Amino acid sequence: KVREVTRYPAVLGHEDAGRVVKIGKKVTSFKVGDLVVRAGQPDNEKFSSAWGGFAEYGIVKDYKAAMADQADVKDINLGITQQVCPEGMQAEAASMLITLKETYSALKRIGVEDKKKMVILGDGPVALAFLSCAKLMGIQEIYVLGNHRDKLETAEKLGAAGTFLNKDEEEKKKASDLFDRKSDICIDTIGSNQTITQCLDYIKETGTIAVYGLKSGENLNVPLPELRNFNIQYVQWPVPEVEAEVHKPVCDAIMDGKIDIDLFVTHRFSIDDYEKGFQAVKDRTALKVVLNF
């Protein structure tokens, strides 16, 4: 359930990139041919919009032009993060920008610039994006705990200082012994009560447990006696203005080869074979799936 979606059927999707084919007469921020992220289908009589990126054509909103014109444009804040990609960036890399910008901006909101040790729970694309972005921000000692050996191997390729198979009790104990209230930051990309509680064993005084995952259900349930002198911060939802600010550094990192998109995108399909892409996600054989029109 997502509270922003109140009517079904709905068009899902927000991790998309496409070329501008037509612009309105008052548009100043985009031109035909620009590669732009986060286009989407708006609400209409047939479908509601759950960001609406799963479509061949979408709409972007010129936030700057609307503000300058003092225009009343519905959902204009969506335009804050609908940004132009640099010349030479491929659409596949551009489609990864959303995950990377959301995680990079979350790290900025948490405040990690002077931190030394980070633990990430989870080994999916969001966890690996946090790893990549934290490395860009200067954190060198980053550990990843997950349940899939192949994805942990990818984490090592992306620069993790160490990885642990979370479902293996022996490896889990090694992690507990290593982190034992010594981590500056714990990033929970799963968001269950179990994983939040697991972070309690790792975080040091004045540290921060940052919950990004959405799996905690209706209620947060953690043992109160364990809550001592650290923060639990929820960063599950991006702040558009902060996400927009990190567009350039994330784009630069991709263009400079500091983030290897090929380590994230494991499956590519034509839109005609979209069911294969969804199945790869369901089977957990994929990290990121790209569907091309």
What are these regions (language model features)?
Residues 1-52, 64:
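Glycine-rich beta-strand-centered segment in the early N-terminal region that forms part
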Residues 5, 43-121:
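NAD(P)H dinucleotide-binding glycine-rich loop of Rossmann-like/cofactor-binding domains
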Residues 17, 36-37, 59, 119, ...:
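Hydrophobic beta-strand signal
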Residues 87-168:
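Mid-domain Rossmann-like dinucleotide-binding core that forms the NAD(H)/NADP(H) cofactor-binding site
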Residues 92-95, 119-123, 143-145, 164, ...:
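Glycine- and other small-residue-rich loops at beta-strand/loop junctions that grip anionic moieties
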Residues 110-114, 153, 157-232:
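Glycine-rich cofactor phosphate-binding loops and adjacent beta1-alpha1 units
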Residues 149, 197-200, 205, 244-293:
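C-terminal hydrophobic helical "lid"/dimerization subdomain
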Residues 172-177, 218-267, 275-276:
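C-terminal substrate-binding/catalytic core of Rossmann-like NAD(P)-dependent dehydrogenases/reductases
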